[in-house]
Amino acid sequence: MKKDALIVAAALSAALGLVGGALAGRNLAKGHGPARSHADSRTSLVPRFAPHLGDLVTALHAPPGKPAPPPKPAAKSQPRPALHLRGTTMSIYEHTAHPWVLAEQGCSAAQRHENGVVVLDFGKPAHKHHGYGTILFSGRFAPNHKITTAMVGYSRGYVRCLPKGSTASITLARGTSNYHPSVPSAYTAGVRWARATNKLGRILAQEGLAEHVEAAAADDAEPAWDPSFHKTKQFFHGFRAAVHGHTLYDYGSLDGGIGAVWSAKQAWYVAGGIRHTKALPEIYNSAMAQEWAELAAIAHGRYHRDVRFAGVMTQGSASCRCGLRPHAAHRILAHALHARGVGHTVLPRGGTNIIG
């Protein structure tokens, strides 16, 4: 009887040792193991490849004389599901051209899983110290080369903070406007803007960032800021002459519709009428959607071409009710296009919401 008791005690001691080892492994993994995702921690605190405690308990209760069931093989790791990519990006009115500030902006965009067109608006064209650049929204002058460096910072931050294996990508557009450009030549300003965009594209390729970031340019072209259309046309013409395949987005307005300030030909010119241009129209209310639908109908009927939309632009934040939200803006523009008989016009889902 004593001998049998010793045998049972030994078996029980060995089983408890196995349980203790598993628990020790769990505590070790929590304290010093590699960092894991929040999703993993919700699933189990036991290391993925450790024996499951349930298997050990089963072994303790196995009938005498029968071998303990073999441990279950470790489950094959499943491929991580693709993260949901946001169809609406955040664009920014920039107050600085410090690359470390824009790197944080890029990292935040990656953490939001943004995917699409991002416009960094650096303000109106300007000229100072024999160089072209812009007046930032802080009122300071930023030369073109510093704007390029800032955009490289944004790109690095975005790529660095993307989850491993992410397929997200953005088109990063160097934004300006036609608001009273303080430059000797609007045409030269357009040429320099294109060359800076080309340079950003080369840097992205050289640094291995081009898989996730594409270089582009953008212009907030608004009729009220240039009623004669002269400087706006010269800027776009200069850009077209020097660009190497990069897109120039028009993220402006039509200010009352066709004929109120600009003619149909002028509005069409900057919204897809010339090479390398696309429209990313401001749709802050339903009236703006109607104006862009009118242009699309005229372009289709008169020029036998469709406006090349790249989505919509909205503005504001949670603390500012500044018009339509992105999904509502897209829906209202789509309805306006359909009502005008040009519902076939391609209107990509999503767009961008600008803050600053």
Predicted regions located by residue number:
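N-terminal export and membrane-targeting signals
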Residues: M1-L12
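N-terminal cationic leader/targeting segments used for protein routing and processing
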Residues: K3-D4, L28-G31, P67, P73, ...
